[in-house]
Amino acid sequence: SNYIHRPLRIHEEEMRETRCLNKKTVSTDSIYRFTSQDPGSFEIILTATNQDGKDSDTLFLKVNGNRFAISDLKNWTGNGENTSVFAIQWVTGEHLQEPADQEVFFIAWGYRWNKTETFTGIDMLKAIAKNDPRLYVALSGNYIKGFGYDGNNDGKIELKSSTLHLTQADFTNGLYELSEYDSDELKPLDAADYWMGSNDAYTTYWLGSGNQVPTAADFEYSQTFVDNRQLENLSWDVWTLSPIDYTSMVNVSPIPRLIKAAEANK
């Protein structure tokens, strides 16, 4: 039996013969794998029983906290006891589905809010866009059309398509309202800046929870729009951008191992 002081997931992987006496098997070992969503130290008491009695021993496990955690965030918006995470994954190369690591720019912000109040994903997004002058969001109502970021922190962003030319002056509190006709093929003119969205890629919304960034398998594609998504303590709202090909339309998943903290405001 196992007594665990802190929550761990236990998976029995296999049974293996380990000890024989006079060519007879006298015991087998069960092999277990222990996993945890959170880092920390864990005490496990193991008890073995046979016809001669029983004995116990204690194991101490330490789960390494190498995964990106909420405590790693640098750029915070809001006040309150609860925390949520907002993150965007840009891809600079042509292959959105299978980018090289160096083509991925994936950053996260923190959002604090009062547990006695109710906030949605759009509330968090707008608050962070207002607070961080490097973040730019194009939307149509509450539909997110695209995300931009001032990569070299020069206080400027410039986006251009065949029909539209935007600068930082066109954004109010980090937001710009686009029509369905004027957002096609926007590109940043400064190679150090980031932009993805418009009509060649659609924003894709993923949800997760926990003190650390969820694994790719633990992120769930959101079944609700951002204005209907109610925040929970330790919730994660992550945006990727997926190619519009009008055939497979496969959503691009987050790549958690590449996430890092958005820099704090100057």
Segments predicted by a language model, with ranges:
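Ubiquitin-like/PB1-type beta-grasp interaction modules and other compact soluble beta-rich domains
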Residues: 58-266
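A short beta-strand segment in extracellular, disulfide-stabilized domains
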Residues: 1-12
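Surface-exposed, flexible coil segments in extracellular/virion-facing regions
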Residues: 18-35
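Residue-level detection of beta-strand-connecting loop/turn positions
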Residues: 22-23, 52, 209, 221
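Extracellular and select intracellular beta-sandwich modules with Ser/Thr-enriched
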Residues: 28, 53-59
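Exposed beta-strand face motif in extracellular beta-rich ectodomains
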Residues: 40-44
